[in-house]
Amino acid sequence: MRKVLVVDGTFLKSKYKGVLLVATALDGNSNLYPIAFAVVDSENDRSWNWFFRQLKVVVPDERALAFVSDRNNSLCKGLENVYPLSQHGICIHHLLNNVVTHYRGKGVVGLIAKASKAYRVVDFQKRFEAVCNISPAIGEYLTDANVTKWARCQFQGYRYDIRTTNPTESINSALRSPREYPVIPLLDSIREMLTRWFFERRTRSRKHTMPLTIAIEKKIDRRINKGKTFLVQPVNEHRFLVRGDTIDCLVDLDRRTCSCGKYDLLKIPCRHAIKAGLTVSRAPSSLTDFMYTTSNWRTAYEETINPIGVPDDSWVVPNTVRNASVLAPESRRGAGRRRKRRYETVEDKLRSSQGAQEKKRRRCSRCGEENHNRATCDRAI
């Protein structure tokens, strides 16, 4: 399991509103692995502090731990108070949306996205300098946002390939209907979802016979194909110079590093490391971090998520709970109909525009020509 937690909040749509706070990780097969849920009145300082204190009971604070979130002030304060040792990264989607909303600059969004994805510091610096040349104001804003929080190669810890809050967005999407339920049915729906996920993945991992998880095996196969034409020059027993890509790369198989940066940051051998390993009969699985192994994947789903087997009328409720005074949640209904679909991000718009350009042109079903349809066709048949 990668030690990266994605945290976010999403609005509930029941009578009393409120917010569902979520913390999730990704397993070795890149599937969602929810860690914690909480229902609170709103995303304020007290709510996030309380949530992180409960989370700390099962996920201790350490320097190897990383969080990825948006730039919500209360969330950031809660992390600083409860998880001072951990590293905090921000979602690149939210950062790009802020840039588009408040600044102008032709082509700057694509450059920022590429800079955030760079594995080498030199590549990041080239792209970031290009952004600053186009718009010094945007460069200043990105610097103030703290480069170490949004640029992968500048991050103080390891965030692997988790650059956005998409994992929590995916959970929110899976709970689209339950988010309209009252609290108890909502929590039971979450439990049912987790029970189903754990059973399906437990079954799937037990059937899988390869040393690495399904997603990583596919990734390794693609990299093997990309590196077929590379030339390997040994430096010593475990260091190799790999030529044939856009840059020559120095690979150290024992230290599990490559000068391209990808092996160092993802802990999965890059195509250069795979090619070097194959020349000395070292399988890619032996060069991959344990978190991506099938055995570790199976361990993650050994336990089961059990339903509550006691009928409601047989529950033993402690007097402290029975006598507690439960206040109505703080909520205000907004004007108009509540939006159910999430707002489209900048990268969503970029992808949709690219898809529109590649879309197949429509033809008239009568004559087969373009730029009109059957109803307006005046061609002679």
Residue ranges of predicted features:
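Active-site beta-loop-alpha junctions of metal-dependent nucleic acid enzymes
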Residues: K15, F37-P60
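Short, intrinsically disordered linker segments that flank or connect zinc-binding domains
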Residues: T246-C249, R339-E358
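Hydrophobic, aromatic-enriched, well-ordered structural segments
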Residues: K56-V58, A64, E80-G89, L96-R337
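Cysteine-centered loop/knuckle micro-motif
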Residues: C270, R374-R379
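Short Cys/His-rich zinc-binding micro-motifs
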Residues: T257-D264, R362-H372
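An active-site-proximal beta-strand-loop segment
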Residues: M1-P34, D41, D45, Q154-F155
